[in-house]
Amino acid sequence: MQITRRSLLTTAFATTLAPAAQAKLVPGEPFSVADDDDQKVEYKYRKQIVDAPISAAPGTVVVNAYYHWLYLILTNNRAVRFGIGTGKYGDWKGETVVGRMEKWPIWTPTPDHLKRRPDLIQYIKGMPGGLKNPMGARAFYLFQNNADTTYRIHGTDVPEHIGTRSTAGCFAMFNADVIWLYDRVKMGTRVVVQS
């Protein structure tokens, strides 16, 4: 087979495009977690460094449910801001701490879920962690006075819900973002939820 200039250029061009066409994956996960789900929403809901929304110690997590943002407070009055999905059935607010953390958590529908969606009864004993699990790749269980509030910060199986009122009350993040946050937050972290 004769190699022409055209075939050489076509092959070279196609080779440079191939990596861009493939989704970047978060390494080390048991399931394929895309690192580019944030491309599915408005730019303002993508992870970025911004001014801190409140004066708080570095490491504090702040949730602003009204604007669909979650912040991890850094030093020098700065924060990492993430877009989130928030509850469609009311606004809960308050101060909590991270009382439990799970990788690829099991999801169990609450009585409220079952009232709205009786078909979820099949998961009454729990849906195993995975890409179709509504809790996504990680979950932070929010506690007050050593008791579970039933509110969570977790991943999502529907990235397009970020920036919308789409959850049953919890705070949903892109799976890549919640994995990133999980690696930086520890048990007992203060979480301030504003509505």
Q: Which positions does each model-derived feature cover?
A:
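N-terminal secretory signal peptides and thylakoid transit peptides that target proteins
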Residues: 1-16
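Boundary at the C-terminal end of the N-terminal hydrophobic targeting segment
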Residues: 20-23
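Cell wall/extracellular polymer interaction/catalysis modules
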Residues: 25-116, 131
